[in-house]
Curated annotation (Swiss-Prot):
PROSITE patterns: RIBOSOMAL_S13_1, RIBOSOMAL_S13_2. Transmembrane segments: none annotated. Part of the 30S ribosomal subunit. Forms a loose heterodimer with protein S19. Forms two bridges to the 50S subunit in the 70S ribosome. This is Small ribosomal subunit protein uS13. Belongs to the universal ribosomal protein uS13 family. Keywords: Ribonucleoprotein, Ribosomal protein, RNA-binding, rRNA-binding, tRNA-binding. Residues 106-121 have a biased composition (Basic residues). GO terms for cellular component: cytosol; small ribosomal subunit. GO terms for molecular function: rRNA binding; structural constituent of ribosome; tRNA binding. Located at the top of the head of the 30S subunit, it contacts several helices of the 16S rRNA. In the 70S ribosome it contacts the 23S rRNA (bridge B1a) and protein L5 of the 50S subunit (bridge B1b), connecting the 2 subunits; these bridges are implicated in subunit movement. Contacts the tRNAs in the A and P-sites. It comes from Enterococcus faecalis (strain ATCC 700802 / V583). One of its GO terms (biological process) is translation.
């Protein structure tokens, strides 16, 4: 396992796929990083030389990934909640923030159903 940005990336997979194990790096970013470094996308991690690994590390260090990115996202959500914006209120209540209907669905965001007692006869 190679260690990049504090994450052990799998050795047996292609470099493009392995880089996506790092939080904040998706397919597109992984391809851009490899293009900047000059490494083929088809190479397996175990076949990388130390120089290539160091170059990839240096390129990824320029990006905001892992802990820094998670912290920034959490601070953005906290800021929205503090200023009392609509999105912040939706975050606080645990509801969808992007305009989806909540009458029937939104179970992922709302959690399991809370059963309400029926009317007694």
């Amino acid at each position: 396992m190679a260690r990049i940005a504090g994450v052990d990336i799998p050795r047996d997979k292609r470099v493009v796929v392995s880089l996506t194990y790092i939080y904040g790096i998706g397919n597109t970013t992984a391809k851009k990083v490899l293009a900047n470094v000059g490494v083929s996308e088809d190479v397996r991690v175990r076949d990388l030389t130390n120089e290539q690994t160091d170059a990839i590390r240096a390129e990824i260090d320029k990006l905001k990934v892992e802990g820094d990115l998670r912290r920034e996202v959490n601070l953005n959500i906290k800021r929205l909640m503090e200023i009392g914006s609509y999105r912040g209120i939706r975050h606080r209540r645990g509801l969808p923030t992007r305009g989806q209907n909540t009458k029937n669905n939104a179970r992922t965001r709302k959690g399991p159903t809370k059963t309400v007692a029926g009317k007694k006869k």
